[in-house]
Amino acid sequence: MTETSYRTGPDEKGLFGRFGGQYVAETLMPLILDLAEEYERAKVDPAFLEELAYFQRDYVGRPSPLYFAERLTEHCGGAKIYLKREELNHTGAHKINNCIGQILLARRMGKQRIIAETGAGMHGVATATVAARFGLQCVIYMGTTDIDRQQANVFRMKLLGAEVIPVTAGTGTLKDAMNEALRDWVTNVETTFYLIGTVAGPHPYPAMVRDFQAVIGKETREQLIEKEGRLPDSLVACIGGGSNAMGLFHPFLDEPGVKIVGVEAAGHGIETGKHAASLNGGVPGVLHGNRTFLLQDADGQIIDAHSISAGLDYPGIGPEHAWLHDIGRVEYSSITDHEALQAFHTCCRLEGIIPALESSHALAEVFKRAPRLPKDHLMVVNLSGRGDKDMQTVMHHMQEKLEKHA
């Protein structure tokens, strides 16, 4: 353990260094403070923790396996690659870890109505799932662009009893869906619980979502010690808002021997401006209730993000990631659409696992790094979700490629 802990944040104001905070409408402030207090009580309440553990085990299907990717390891010819199989969770991604935690909190607070934003649709599906399980009304905000590319997930949400509200504003993606959800929350503050899907938003959301996702890193630690007798040498995860990454990273932040790498979406390339890499191509600003790195123009207006992956298509990043970038504890790189698609195909062909396009960004980074590392280097990559939802996108890109070469 290091003498200075990287795991004590945020402070009482919800700040991680100069990032985070509570930039919300006055009407929301009492609710935000109430939520923060309720969460502080819940996280030390044995009954709450016992119920959370029960649902993680028997409903979500945890622990998720830590799998030695033998053929990917052979393919790279260097580091030993392990996959943390979050795509095997109920609903097919890491999102359910957070949704179970927050729905138990919503029920504890007596809320009858759940709202959420979604990009790739996985958080929407997970929210609709837990709302159905606990008999609560559910409204999901989703941008029209994302609805077009994630029709299967839209149908799943409706099947689970949720109302899906299309958002036409802006580019019709995650940022716009989050704006609408925040407007709804201000209007229906008494009855409604806003179930945010990532480590962004006003305090206490970044810390709360991280805590519910930290089960990923805690399990990884135990599982790798059991398999290899030691901690990993490096961790790799993709980043949109950054909840799957923070869930893997947080339990290891105070281990100086563990290198940590977050992977943003470079889209068509950082230099083109068509990307979603807030740390590699953005500047600090305020969005959705917190101060963090954002994609902005010279006038401070939010620039639309681009990624082939709907779940990474966000012009900001969780404030704790912004702080970890600032202090240099975590290295943040970026991967293009093309590189992610190549990694997607490689994983399918070599391991018989169809990863989400989000997770494929992390895999692409692994394929760059692993060949340069010694064979005894233990590398864990978070396979945050499965790729069923991305078939339409991948088919479209393969078709384009075939037509180009015809």
Swiss-Prot record:
It catalyses: (1S,2R)-1-C-(indol-3-yl)glycerol 3-phosphate + L-serine = D-glyceraldehyde 3-phosphate + L-tryptophan + H2O. The keyword Amino-acid biosynthesis applies. Its cofactor is pyridoxal 5'-phosphate. One of its GO terms (cellular component) is cytoplasm. Disulfide bonds: none annotated. The modification N6-(pyridoxal phosphate)lysine is found at K95. Pathway: Amino-acid biosynthesis; L-tryptophan biosynthesis; L-tryptophan from chorismate: step 5/5. Keywords: Amino-acid biosynthesis, Aromatic amino acid biosynthesis, Lyase, Pyridoxal phosphate, Tryptophan biosynthesis. PROSITE patterns: TRP_SYNTHASE_BETA. It is an enzyme of class 4 (lyase). Its EC number is 4.2.1.20. One of its GO terms (molecular function) is tryptophan synthase activity. Belongs to the TrpB family. The beta subunit is responsible for the synthesis of L-tryptophan from indole and L-serine. NCBIfam families: trpB. Tetramer of two alpha and two beta chains. This is Tryptophan synthase beta chain. The lineage of its organism: Bacteria, Pseudomonadati, Pseudomonadota, Gammaproteobacteria, Pseudomonadales.
